[in-house]
């Protein structure tokens, strides 16, 4: 009799998932947790009847968790707050997560630790296998103890004129979801300064209001936005190979602010030019909510072409004075400057091979005299930029750390190199890691960079499912990118997926 009733229920399409056998796969989490155990045959459901215990000294943790549940799942569970440090959670960003059929426990020593626990819970949960439309979510019973190996876990995004505000927000949300705690956002002529509007494109999307909104959103999600403005080279606000100059192409009256040979450098002998830079930095730092860091670029600068700049010998005196002025200005505002490393190393010096050195002999001396509260961002791109994924040593990182600087290793799009550099940052006790993305913000490469960098900065290797899955559409990044799209209410086809379109016009015309 029982067997016939069961068959009737199945035939009628109302077979209840709770009565079925289940065999959950290992939860696929980015970044991979340090300790994770789970029971493949024990489902835990997320529904309005569940009991959720939040252990955290910060009383606002319960309200944040309740709000996220409402946004993600459409219901608010019963939440019990225990206002004490979470047993097993280490440091400010560590967390614990326990899921059982009768209750789920999220714990952290800070609100951000609780946020990380909830992000992990969401990544572990899957839709229930019943019905034609979504009925709910479930996950295997599990226990997780997790803590990051690096304090500074950053990712560097560029906001090009071709990027939409929606896409940039999508990236910022993803960074928080992957437990990066800093996002450096470099404006490529898109910050609409109210004091100096000619330094941006017409209808620039990154207004002061938008900067404030994104900074507040990022903070709520657990990540700090750090603005970047290039105060030395890269003054064009565009890639050199594109031949564009954000200001001079449209506003030739501002030529005195830039070097005459292409306008790549700011004219550092012109006090009006350096004043404009400082005013712009001040405005941008304020717009982003006065974060604790500000990135000033300072990479890949040209030799001076301006006759008054060339008359100053050595030219490095102008450069150092300019950097110090901006550093002092931001220090007074409670912030430390970050800068790329390459102009602080003499090009051609064999000690630095295969790493990058673009400075003159005199500019290289600045490394010994600049204040040690500057954060050095040492970029090295492995086998995709004239180097190797696994160099025998990291002489430049060791050099700057030995001089007393807080030093970040900054990989790019070499997955093996990302892993190795993250490991070295942990073993050498560096300040942290800053993953760079540049123009590779779409497709499989972007997915690989983000997953790999999140793991490397956190300090755990990805599980076998993620290493061996050949399909980008099946990898966790695809699901996570889509989840964030749901959170944002994205419905525009061009804003979904990894590319703006499925195929390009030239493919369709073949």
Task: Locate predicted features.
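Positively charged n-region of N-terminal signal peptides that target proteins for export
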Residues: 1-4
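Hydrophobic h-region of N-terminal signal peptides that target proteins for export
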Residues: 8-18
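Acidic, contiguous N-terminal accessory segments
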Residues: 19-145, 354, 361-362, 379
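Substrate-binding groove of N-acetylhexosamine-processing glycoside hydrolases
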Residues: 29-32, 36-39, 46, 54-55, ...
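Short loop/turn motifs enriched for small/polar and acidic residues
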Residues: 55, 82, 228-230, 299, ...
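Flexible loop/turn segments at secondary-structure boundaries
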Residues: 60-61, 162-164, 175, 190-194, ...
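A generic structural motif
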Residues: 74-88, 132-135, 184-191, 410-414, ...
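Feature activates predominantly on carbohydrate-active enzymes
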Residues: 97-338
């Amino acid at each position: 009799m029982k067997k016939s009733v069961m068959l009737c229920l199945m035939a009628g399409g109302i077979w209840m998932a709770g009565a079925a056998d289940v065999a959950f796969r290992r939860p696929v989490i980015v970044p991979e947790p340090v300790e994770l155990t789970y029971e493949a045959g024990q489902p835990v459901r997320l529904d309005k009847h569940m009991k959720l215990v939040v252990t955290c000294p910060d009383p606002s943790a319960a309200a944040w968790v309740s709000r996220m549940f409402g946004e993600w799942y459409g219901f608010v569970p019963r939440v019990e707050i225990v206002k004490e440090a979470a047993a097993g959670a280490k440091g400010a960003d560590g967390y614990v997560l326990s899921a059982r059929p009768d209750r789920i426990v999220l714990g952290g020593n800070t609100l951000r630790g609780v946020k990380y626990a909830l992000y992990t819970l969401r990544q572990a949960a899957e839709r229930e296998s019943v019905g034609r439309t979504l009925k709910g979510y479930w996950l295997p019973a599990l226990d997780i103890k997790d803590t990051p190996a690096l304090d500074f876990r950053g990712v560097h995004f560029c906001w090009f004129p071709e990027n939409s505000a929606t896409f940039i927000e999508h990236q910022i949300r993803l960074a928080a979801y992957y437990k990066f705690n800093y996002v450096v956002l470099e404006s490529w002529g898109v910050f609409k300064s109210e004091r100096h509007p000619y330094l941006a494109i017409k209808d620039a999307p990154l207004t002061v209001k938008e900067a404030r909104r994104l900074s507040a959103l990022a903070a709520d999600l657990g990540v700090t936005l750090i603005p970047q403005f290039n105060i030395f080279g890269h003054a064009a606000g565009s890639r050199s190979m594109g031949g564009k100059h954000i200001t001079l192409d449209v506003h030739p009256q501002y030529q005195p602010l830039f070097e005459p040979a292409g306008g790549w450098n700011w004219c550092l002998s012109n006090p009006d030019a350096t004043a404009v830079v400082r005013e712009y930095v001040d405005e941008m730092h304020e717009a982003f909510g006065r974060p604790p860091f500000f990135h000033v670029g300072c990479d890949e600068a040209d030799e001076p072409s301006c006759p008054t700049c060339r008359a100053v010998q050595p030219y490095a005196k102008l450069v150092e004075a300019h950097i110090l002025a901006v550093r002092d200005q931001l220090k007074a505002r409670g912030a430390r400057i970050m800068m790329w490393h390459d102009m602080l190393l003499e090009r051609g010096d064999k000690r630095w091979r295969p790493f990058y050195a673009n400075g003159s002999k005199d500019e290289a001396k600045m490394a010994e005299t600049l204040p040690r509260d500057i954060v050095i961002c040492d970029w090295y791109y492995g086998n995709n930029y004239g180097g190797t994924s696994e160099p025998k040593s990291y002489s430049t990182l060791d050099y700057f750390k030995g001089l007393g600087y807080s030093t970040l290793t900054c990989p790019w799009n070499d997955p093996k190199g990302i892993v190795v550099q993250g490991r070295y940052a942990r073993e050498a006790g560096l300040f942290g890691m800053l993953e760079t993305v540049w123009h590779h913000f779409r497709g499989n490469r972007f997915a690989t960079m983000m997953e790999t960098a999140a793991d490397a900065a956190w300090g755990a290797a990805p599980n076998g499912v993620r290493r061996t899955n050949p399909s980008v559409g099946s990898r966790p990044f695809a699901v996570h990118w889509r989840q964030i799209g749901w959170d944002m209410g994205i419905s525009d086809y061009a804003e979904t997926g990894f590319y703006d379109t499925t195929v390009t016009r030239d493919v369709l015309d073949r």
